[in-house]
Amino acid sequence: MISVKLVSYTNDGEKVIAIAAKMSRSRKGWDYHEKDMTDDEIETWIRDAILHGYWSVLEHSVYTFSIEEISRVASHQLVRHRIASYTQMSHRFAKPIDEYYKPIIPPSAKKRSKELVEKAYKEAYDNYYTLLESGVPEEDARYVLPNGVNTNIVVTMNARELYNFFSLRLCSRAQWEIRAIAWKMLEEVKKVHPRLFKYTGPNCIIHENFIRNENESITLEDIFKDYKLEFISQRCIEGVLRDGIKKCIINSRSVLDNIK
């Protein structure tokens, strides 16, 4: 089962971002702003930066995740987000044999063709092991491993990149596994920096807040709690009409229920 754990982060990230945002509009230095910065002021400066697209200040807070038991399909999608750092389990040095060979079966295949997928995975494993026993080096034998083979990866992103990552990967149009990873990553960062990630979400949320009045901005929490909430946008950038956007977001998060 997919595991996502936040293992390291900028402890005062919210305050750092707020001070950086304030310093950009002030002649005063860090010490002056830090000593008088209140929690309410931190929230105000973060909110102002996000709702006005002042994204550069978000780069000062950094997060490292350990993401485990995912497929190579998912890890290949992760590394497409280039403003990040990655260290992945090597199948050259960490051979996926015996109990460590746990390829991922997609939920759709579990419902329809689980036996077929398991058979294909077993054949691939048997061929891989045969190649190893015949003397083929690990770096070459791994060529026959399936894309579904399980892997672990350490990922580091700053808050700005996370906002970009979430805008794309929390969307219901994202593939199920990378979407599940994104929702789990969001859960992790919200535990430590709820004010900073209050306004994140798929692109439809970001765009909606750009066209709303500041005192009418919405959050993902509003989507799941207020069933009367209506979007102003006529359609999202993926083409979903206004009346269907909220349902689309709710359906996107349901991927977490499908992988339990």
Swiss-Prot record:
- InterPro entries linked: Thymidylate_synthase_ThyX, Thymidylate_synthase_ThyX_sf
One GO process term, biological-process aspect: methylation
| List of residues binding dUMP | Q77, L78, V79, R80, Q88, M89, S90, H91, R92, R142, R169
Q: Which GO terms describe its molecular function?
A: flavin adenine dinucleotide binding; NADPH binding; thymidylate synthase (FAD) activity; thymidylate synthase activity
Pathway assigned in UniProt: Pyrimidine metabolism; dTTP biosynthesis
On subunit structure and binding partners, the annotation says: Homotetramer.
Protein name (Swiss-Prot/TrEMBL) = Flavin-dependent thymidylate synthase
User: Which species is this UniProt entry from?
Assistant: Saccharolobus solfataricus (strain ATCC 35092 / DSM 1617 / JCM 11322 / P2)
Q: What is the primary gene name for this protein?
A: thyX
